[in-house]
Amino acid sequence: AVLISVLVLPALLYLFFVYGQSEVFFQTLDYVGPDEVVANDGGFDTVHYTIPDFEFYNTDSAVVTRTEMDSTIYVLSFFFATCPTICPAMNFHLNEIQKRFKGYDQFKLVSITVDPEKDSPSALKAYQKERNYDPAKWTFLTGDQAAIYELAKAVYLNAFEDQTAEGGFLHSTSAIIIDWDGHIRSRKDDLGNIVGSYDVLDVTQLNDLEDDIKVLIAEYERDKHNQRDE
């Protein structure tokens, strides 16, 4: 309990800082992907890009859809269990991120295999158990390979077979943040360009990822607070 308090405390202090400030000082993350302008009551609204619906299977063979992840902030990545190169390091760093927010129920990790033929629900369950990854905080998914690769493309990450690569697959070392409405969120770089994703093998980008999760948590809690006051 003491360890959890120490790990979560920086995020809680950030929330306290944000709520102690005027609304005008609140800074949040940008939306990734093309916006759509739609007519509404004689005016126009901006609809932010939402990741496509998906239907995959978790380690208990239960169906998980995108809409079931609503009201959750999650970091999405791609991997495969027999990956001999980058995946062990990727998931080590992602696990450290997860530990930082262990006390916040609305935050999770979601990792989707790019090798569903080998990575069945039971295989992923064994993989998760062997590495002691918390099933309450980290969801591993498998499913139709074509659907997985289409989702990767739709969220601007790479995932495909490559027989010349070690393990037979190539995928991004980057992860993305998905907010509670299915939007990809990210900071801007020093030149004002939206970063989009975070290379979890890069220490600087890992720190950015952690900081940006705190920002989204603050925004989510602020919005819930404002809705209660309406």
Features from the language model and the residues they span:
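N-terminal targeting signals for export/organelle localization
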Residues: 1-51, 223, 228-229
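Structural microenvironment flanking redox-active thiols in thiol-disulfide oxidoreductases
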Residues: 91-151
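Short loop/turn microsegments at loop-to-beta-strand junctions
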Residues: 51-52, 74, 172-174
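Thiol-/selenol-based redox modules, centered on thioredoxin-like
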Residues: 164-230
